[in-house]
Regions:
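Short, surface-exposed polybasic-aromatic patches that bind anionic ligands, especially phosphate groups
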Residues: 1-173
Length: 175
C-alpha cells in the first residue's frame, strides 16, 4: 500500500515492521502494535528500544485487535499469510489513530519492489486494504466493549489425593 507523503510530495510505500515484546515473566514473544503512528520507534532509525507495554483503553482499538490479528487467522479473511493480517490490522489501528479510513489514505502499489511485480503487489495489496477497511469500520461501529475477565470459582469440599495413570495428584472440585 502507498500513502501520500506530504513532506516529500510523493506517494511512498507503507513499511510495516512486525514488532513484538518479550514478556519478562515467561520470556515469550508477543506481538505489539503501536497505536501512535507519529511516534518514532522500530523502523524509523532505531534498532530496538525499551518501552513500557501498556493497555490502551479504547474500545475501538480493542475491537480491531480482537477481530483482526489477535482474534482471527489470515485464512478466515482470505489473505495469503499471517504477515498480511498483521499488516491489515496495523493499517486499521493507524487509521483509527489518525481519523482517516484506510481506503481514503492508501492506494494500491504502483511500482515493483523487492522483486515483486506491480500485478502481484496490487493483487495482495487489494486484499490487505479491504481487510484493513473492514477492521477499521468494525472498530468504529462495533458494539462490543472490553471487560476485564472475571472468574467466580467456589471450592466444593476438601481436596483429595488421587492416583491417575500411576501419578499422585491433588484434586479439588469447584463450582
Amino acid at each position: 500500500l502507498e500513502y501520500w507523503m506530504e513532506d516529500y510530495q510523493k506517494w511512498s510505500y507503507k513499511i510495516i515492521w512486525y514488532v513484538y515484546y518479550l514478556d519478562k515473566d515467561d520470556g515469550q514473544k508477543y506481538p505489539a502494535f503501536c497505536v501512535q503512528p507519529a511516534r518514532k520507534g522500530v523502523g524509523t532509525g532505531y534498532e530496538s528500544y525499551d518501552g513500557t507495554v501498556t493497555k490502551f483503553g479504547d474500545d475501538r482499538v480493542w475491537r480491531v485487535l480482537n477481530k483482526g490479528y489477535m482474534g482471527s487467522t489470515y485464512k478466515e479473511w482470505n489473505l495469503e499469510c499471517d504477515d498480511d493480517l498483521y499488516s491489515a490490522t496495523k493499517v486499521a489501528l493507524h487509521s483509527i489513530a489518525e481519523g482517516i479510513a484506510p481506503k481514503d489514505k492508501y492506494i494500491l502499489g504502483t511500482r515493483s519492489v523487492d522483486g515483486n511485480t506491480v500485478e502481484e503487489i496490487r493483487r495482495r495489496g487489494e486484499k490487505v486494504l479491504n481487510v484493513a477497511q473492514s477492521l477499521y469500520e468494525y472498530g468504529l461501529n462495533g458494539q462490543e466493549v472490553y471487560t476485564l475477565p472475571f472468574v467466580n470459582a467456589i471450592r466444593k469440599g476438601e481436596h483429595k489425593e488421587e492416583v491417575i495413570e500411576n501419578n499422585l495428584y491433588y484434586t479439588q472440585e469447584y463450582q
